[in-house]
Amino acid sequence: MLKLLLGDPNARKLKRYQPIVSDIQLLEEEIAPLSDDELRGRTAAFQERLANAGSLANQRPILDEILPEAFAVVREAGKRVLGMRHFDVQLIGGMVLHEGQIAEMKTGEGKTLVATLPSYLNALTGRGVHVVTVNDYLARRDAEWMGQVHRFLGLSVGLIQQDMRPEERRRNYNCDITYATNSELGFDYLRDNMAADISEVVQREFQYCVIDEVDSILIDEARTPLIISGQVERPQEKYQQAAEVANALARAAELSKDGIDPEGDYEVDEKQRSCTLTDEGFAKAEQMLGVADLFNPQDPWAHYITNALKAKELFVKDVNYIVRDGEAVIVDEFTGRVMPGRRWSDGQHQAIEAKEALAIQSETQTLASITYQNFFLLYPRLAGMTGTAKTEEVEFEKTYKLETTIVPTNRVRARQDWADQVYKTEAAKWRAVANETAEIHKNGRPVLVGTTSVEKSELLSSLLAEQEIPHNLLNAKPENVERESEIVAQAGRAGAVTIATNMAGRGTDIILGGNSDYMARLKLREVLLGRLVKPEEDHTPPVPLQRSAPGGFSDAAAPSLPRSGESLYPCPLTDDTDQALGQLARDLVKAWGDRALTVIELEERIATAAEKAPTEAPQIQALREAIARVKGEYDAVVKQEESRVREAGGLHVIGTERHESRRVDNQLRGRAGRQGDPGSTRFFLSLGDNLLRIFGGDRVAGLMNAFRVEEDMPIESGMLTRSLEGAQKKVETYYYDIRKQVFEYDEVMNNQRRAVYSERRRVLDGRALKKQVIGYGERTMGEIVEAYVNPDLPPEEWDLDQLVGKVKEFIYLLEDLTPDQVQGLGMEELKAFLQEQLRNAYDLKEGQIEQQRPGLMREAERFFILQQIDTLWREHLQAMDALRESVGLRGYGQKDPLIEYKNEGYDMFLEMMTNMRRNVIYSMFMFQPQAPKN
C-alpha cells in the first residue's frame, strides 16, 4: 500500500542517476577521439585538481563534480583495453558504489567491471582504494584483468596474496588501488598493531573500500572473529582421554524438559550447537576419569569433555572439515572451500584431532582479534556489491549504515524457476536428482548440481557413475580445488554435468557452449608446462570431461557424449597450429630458459598475454598471437555448441537442499540464465534435510505421517513450501540475532581496541614520547596521593610515611625525600609538589642514560611502553573472554548480561591502562643500561 502511495523508493533512487548517465554519454563522444596519451592526461588533470583541495572533506565535493567525466574516461579505457564497454546500468552501479551504498546486481551483470568506476574515481585522491574479494584467486584475477584499465590510465595497481613478505605488502598497499581478500586485510591490520617498529607497518590509513560479494563477507563471516594467536602448552593426553570418554557416553534421544534430564549421558542441541552432560553423564565421566569433580579448578576436565562431545556430534568429517596430510582442515560452511591454516579456537580443534587420532597441536592464546563488522567500519566510506542483498537489507542498514539499491539488469531475465520437489526420504531424493540430471544431459543441456557437502557430492557422483553419465566433481577435496576454473570453463558445454559444493557459486561465470578464451589459455599452459616449468613443481594437467567412474575420476569413455575430441578441448587443433605451438615453445625456451619458471610465473605470463593491454615484450606478443589463433579454431565449434545449448534450453541448475539462508539458494539459482540467457532451476528436498529437521519443528513431522505416499513420489504442497520459507526466515533471524550479539559485545572491545591501538601508533610514530611518559608519571603521582590521603581527615592524620615510601618504590632517585618535606601541604599542593619532583628526577635519569648513548632514552621509552601495552592487552583479552563466558549466567539474576559486560569491561580496561602507566614509569626509572665494553 505504501509503495502505491509513495512510489518505489528504489525506482526513485534510480531516477536520480538517469541525468548523470546522459551526461556521461555526451562526454563519451568528446572523449572517444582522444589519443591514449591524451586519455591518460585526464587522470593527471583530475589528480592535480584534487591535490590542491587538501583534506578529504574538501575533496569529496570535487569527486562528485568530476564523476561524469571520470566515468566516461574509464568507459573509454575499458573499450580500448578489455574490449568491454560499461552498460548504462553498470554506470548506475558505479554511482551507487561511489556514494557508499550496496549495489545489488544479478549474476553475470559484470560486477567486476562495475568496480573499476568508483575505484578509479576514489583512487584519484591518492589516499588508496581497497577492492576486496572472497579468495586469493579472485583477487589475483581481478588485479590482472581489471587492473589493466587502471594501469592504462596511469594509476598503480597492487595485489595482496597470502604468502607475500611484509616489504611486498607495503609496496602493494602504497599503490593507488589494491586488490586483496578480506582476511588478508584484517590480519595485516592486526599485525600492524602488534609491530615493534614503524618500519614493520604495511598498511596506510583507510579511505575507501569496495567489497565484492559483500553479503558473504559482512554477513556470513561476521560470526567468526579474526584472531592472531600465540601458543600455550596444555596437556595433550587430556584431549585423548576426553575423546575416549566421549565415545563411551551415550547420546540422549531428546532434550531435557522442565529441568528433568532425559534418558542418556548427554544431550545435543543442534540449533544452539551445544552438548550438555546429564547428571548421569557427569557421574559416568567422573568415574571413568577417576576424579571427584569435573570442575575442580586445580584439575579441570569439564571443558575437555564438552569439546570432545561437540567433536563427536556436531563436527562431521567431510562436512565441517576434511583430513589432509595428517591434519584436520576446516571447510567453510558457506563457500565449501577449505581454509588451511585456520583453526577452531578454545581447544575445539584439538578435540577434533583427538577424535580423528591425529597429532594434537598446541592450543593457542589470543594476541589480537577483531570482527569483520568492526574492521570494515574503520573505513570512512564503504561500499559493496552482490547478486543477493535485499534479503539482508535491514542488517546492512542497522550494523553498517549501508543502504541497498537494486540495479536493473541489462537484459530481461529468461530463466524459469521450477517448483520444489520434496521427497519423503533422502535416498529417494538423491535417486530423483540423478534421474533428472540424466534426463537433462540426454537432451544435450548442461547441468550444474549444487550440493551442501563433500560427502553428498561424492554420493551423487557414484549414482551418476552407475548410470554411466560423465561428470566433473568440484568440492573442497584438494585434488578438485586446483581444477576449479578449468571445470567451470567447460560447465556450459552441451551435455556437461558438473557437481559442485557451494564453492562453485562465486567468481567464474558459466558461459553456454564453453569458454573458448579460457580453453585456449589452458591449451597453451598444457603445451608449455613440460618445457618451461621446473620438473619438481607439482602441477596438475587440465581435467578432461570424460569421467564416469565413482567420484568422477576414471578415464572410462562415456557412451553418449555430444563431444568432439577426447579431451576438455572443443576440437583437435589443425596440424599448422600444432606446429606453430611447438615452434613457440622452442622460442620461449631460448628466451626464458629450459624449465626455469614456476607454474605461477608461467600462468601470470599467459594471463598477461591474454589481456589486451599494449606490451613491448616480443615473447608476450608471440604468446598473445598463439592464444588468438587457438581461440579462433575453438570459437568455430564453441559458437555452434552455444546455439545448440540455447535451443535446448540453456543451463539447468539443481539444488539438492535448501540452505539455511535464502540468499545462498538465490546465488545458486543465479548461475543459470545470466545476461538474458535461457536456463532453468529446480530444488529437490527431503523431509530429512537439516533445515527441516532442526528448524522445521513438529509441523513437518506431522506432515510426514499425513503423507502416506510412495517413497519415490514427490510431494508438492503450498503448506510445505510455506513451512520451508518460514524455517529459512527463522534461521536467518536466529543467525542475525547471534551476529547482532557478537557485534554488540565486540563493540565494547572495539572502543577499547581503538584506544589501545591509537596509543600504540602514537608510540610507533615516536611523537613526543618523553611528554607521554612524564604524563604517565604525573597521573601515577596523583593516584598515589589519592590512595594515601583522605581529604575528609585533618592533615595531621594523613599517613605521609607510607605515601613517601610508595613514591620511592617507583622513583628510587627520590630516596632523599622525607615526610617532613611534604608536611603542611594541601592535597592539590601535594600532587603538584610530587609531580614537580618526578619531572626533575626524570630529567636526571635522562641525563644518566643519554651519557651511555645519545637517543637511548627515547628507545627505552618506546620499548617499555610497547612491551607493557602488548603484555597487558593480551592478558586483558583473556580476562574479557572469561568475563563474556561468565556474564551470561547473570541473566538468571534479572540483570542484563550486556550491560554487566560493558560496566565490568570498562572497569577492567581502566585498571589495565593504570597498570600500564605505572609499570612504564617503574621500568623507566629501574632501567640500568650496561656500559659498552671496550
Swiss-Prot record:
Keyword Metal-binding: no
Subcellular location(s) of the protein: Cell inner membrane; Cellular thylakoid membrane; Cytoplasm
Region (Disordered): 535-565
EC class (word): translocase
GO molecular function: ATP binding; protein-exporting ATPase activity
Protein residues bound to ATP: Q90, G108, E109, G110, K111, T112, D509
Family: Belongs to the SecA family.
Its job: Part of the Sec protein translocase complex. Interacts with the SecYEG preprotein conducting channel. Has a central role in coupling the hydrolysis of ATP to the transfer of proteins into and across the cell membrane, serving as an ATP-driven molecular motor driving the stepwise translocation of polypeptide chains across the membrane. Probably participates in protein translocation into and across both the cytoplasmic and thylakoid membranes in cyanobacterial cells.
Protein name as catalogued: Protein translocase subunit SecA
Organism taxonomic ancestry: Bacteria, Bacillati, Cyanobacteriota, Cyanophyceae, Synechococcales
Gene: secA
